[in-house]
Amino acid sequence: YFGICLGMQIAAIAFARGVLGYEDANSTEFAPDSKHPVIALMEEQMDLADMGGTMRLGAYPCRISPDTLMMKAYGKGLIEERHRHRYEFNNKFREVYMEHGAIFSGQSPDGTLVEAMEIPGHPFYLGVQYHPEFKSRPNRAHPIFREFVKAALEVKEKNS
């Protein structure tokens, strides 16, 4: 699985429902009254009435954890990726996710924002909050796309 932006958010919701047993887990974008809002508005936007121009937009740094798919793909501990979103992983759920095996392999340098989530034990299970497609080119694929295709080919070969 490789989820980009909303794809990472959906992976986080699926983990909450399937692994944590939070049947009503959701994003406040889709279910504002969810008892388990694992995806929510960025904290600095919670009290805003007018959302115009409030996205997290542009390039931001991301710190990568060692021994992760992210580190395997990038080969370095600090990267910069482009964003376009206003919803993010709700840190109130971070500890319970980690207790149940989720790995937050990419974070803002200060550790407050989840940038990437992995689930070990799969050939490839990675969700990223940013948009790697913005930095990928036909003659120079983004490192995560390369790793995803490589993992898919390895699974295909193993199952042939």
Q: Across the structure, where does each feature detected by a protein language model lie?
A:
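Amide-donor transfer/coupling interface in amidating biosynthetic enzymes
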Residues: 18-160
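Catalytic nucleophile loop
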Residues: 1-16
